[in-house]
Amino acid sequence: MIDFGNFYSLIAKNHLSHWLETLPAQIANWQREQQHGLFKQWSNAVEFLPEIKPYRLDLLHSVTAESEEPLSAGQIKRIETLMRNLMPWRKGPFSLYGVNIDTEWRSDWKWDRVMPHLSDLTGRTILDVGCGSGYHMWRMIGAGAHLAVGIDPTQLFLCQFEAVRKLLGNDQRAHLLPLGIEQLPALKAFDTVFSMGVLYHRRSPLEHLWQLKDQLVNEGELVLETLVIDGDENTVLVPGDRYAQMRNVYFIPSALALKNWLKKCGFVDIRIADVSVTTTEEQRRTEWMVTESLADFLDPHDPGKTVEGYPAPKRAVLIARKP
């Protein structure tokens, strides 16, 4: 059973304490009524993982944990088998006591693009919206963050996060809650808010930007990463039924249009930090994610287009400040 009590105790003593007015009831409702049919199977995999205290832990350059003495072949096999019970692994990679989880996405590449443009994360309280398995939260902790809170309603991601946390010595500096941004009150409590790979899934992208702003302290920093297309400040793609085989893609703006959207929502000091084409080296099928990936979503005769004929995925990172 995944227990959120440690998180409640933690925030009871800091500037997130007002969240306790609503959060425990939301989590109790989720536990009672909304759990996935496979959740018990996934949470059992977490429970059966060994308790290990890492001798060497690197969260600055990767997410790597090592023991003082090498684990036995049987111990490694146990960890690998239990972690494979939590497939598919989409965001990573993780290197845990000789078990190398080669995830669909090289999320470390995204972090390397984003990190140089961030304000110093040392001592910051961070919210990561749509955090997936929590890979980037661990990198935030490695960069000096005091606390990283992730929200993502996908329950497999929660179990993946808890599995990694257990193998990192039950590290309590990062926490994942099975909630969507729309379930959060306007906390106005986070120094930095990340939204990476979420905006294009929202039916109302400006509402999403307002929701992100409501989580920031004054002078707080927003880090927004999303799909974009080429064009001027008036260019926005509204795909038909699917984009790169994804059904739930609603709006893909140009980076300049996105900058205007942020301005309209009251953000300042808005800058386009990076624009990069997503490659089949960064997103691909692996032993830990065996179904279709980016190569299957692109036109086989023109990799500059999706199978639907739209421009192939390109992603931008924008940084902005809440005044």
Curated annotation (Swiss-Prot):
Keyword Transferase: yes
Pfam families attached to this UniProt entry: Methyltransf_9
Reactions listed under catalytic activity: carboxy-S-adenosyl-L-methionine + 5-hydroxyuridine(34) in tRNA = 5-carboxymethoxyuridine(34) in tRNA + S-adenosyl-L-homocysteine + H(+)
SUPFAM superfamilies in the cross-refs: S-adenosyl-L-methionine-dependent methyltransferases
Domain of life: Bacteria
Matching InterPro entries: CmoB, Mo5U34_MeTrfas-like, SAM-dependent_MTases_sf
Annotated GO biological process: tRNA wobble uridine modification
EC number of this enzyme: 2.5.1.-
Binding site for carboxy-S-adenosyl-L-methionine: K91, W105, K110, G130, D152, P153, T154, I181, E182, M196, Y200, R315
Name of the protein: tRNA U34 carboxymethyltransferase
Annotated organism of origin: Escherichia coli O6:H1 (strain CFT073 / ATCC 700928 / UPEC)
Gene: cmoB
